[in-house]
Amino acid sequence: MGIFSVSRSTDAKKLEALLVEGERIESIYKLRVDQICFTNKRIIFFDNKMFSKKKVRVFLPYKTIESFAIQEAGMFDPDTGLLLMTRSKTFELEFAKDTDLSEVQAVLTKHLCS
């Protein structure tokens, strides 16, 4: 799953340094500006805006996510996205054009409904 092969990706090797004991990378997807990593325990991504100088690495445990929404490409808006809603904040992530969001939805549903 994911657009990167977890075992071969240099991005995966960088992310492995951020993992805790017993945590493993399940999939990595390309975002419009960066990437998002789904592990067996949480989601890791940068919360940044394209023109902002600040990049904040976000570690979001699945248990903190209250709901999510998938934004599909439309006729006049080719971007696809994901909204992750927590009690305190909503994160809006824009994916690369060729990302299969049904895969992303399946990964999230697996973790949130179990």
From Swiss-Prot:
InterPro entries associated with the record: PHb, PHb_sf
Domain of life, source organism: Bacteria
Pfam families with a match to the protein in the record: bPH_1
CDD domains: PH-like_bacteria (cd13225)
PANTHER family, A to Z: BHLH DOMAIN-CONTAINING PROTEIN, HYPOTHETICAL CYTOSOLIC PROTEIN
The protein's name: Uncharacterized protein YozO
Species of the source: Bacillus subtilis (strain 168)
